[in-house]
Amino acid sequence: MQILTGTAKFDNASFQFLHKTIDVFGSVVLVEGCDPTRSITWVHAWTVTDGVITQVREYFNTSLTVTRFGKSDISSITTLHCPSVWESSLPNRVGKSVPGLVLAL
């Protein structure tokens, strides 16, 4: 956990997590950031239960889009509505092409 918060004591060659944004969607916390030279971008998706991080998903140099499943009536067959609620912004700023991924909440 000290590495994630940036409080660990390491030499200068170690990776530094510099967060740029923190957003919350229900029990999921999204933290986006980059390294000091902005050559590596990352997104952490933490699932928090009763104040405890119970799951961590980590994405490096990936453009992440978060969607939320819409509610639908079970008795009818309709197109599933999955609106985008969050998109990573840092990969576009560092000027490189990265793979894209959708995280469904």
UniProtKB/Swiss-Prot annotation:
Domain of life: Eukaryota
Gene this protein is translated from: WUN1
Organism in which the protein naturally occurs: Solanum tuberosum
Induction trigger: Mechanical wounding induces a rapid increase of this protein. In leaves, this increase is inhibited by the addition of osmotically active agents.
Protein family per UniProt: To potato anionic peroxidase.
One Pfam family hit: WI12
Organism placement in taxonomy: Eukaryota, Viridiplantae, Streptophyta, Embryophyta, Tracheophyta
The protein's name: Wound-induced protein 1
Tissue and organ distribution: Ubiquitous.
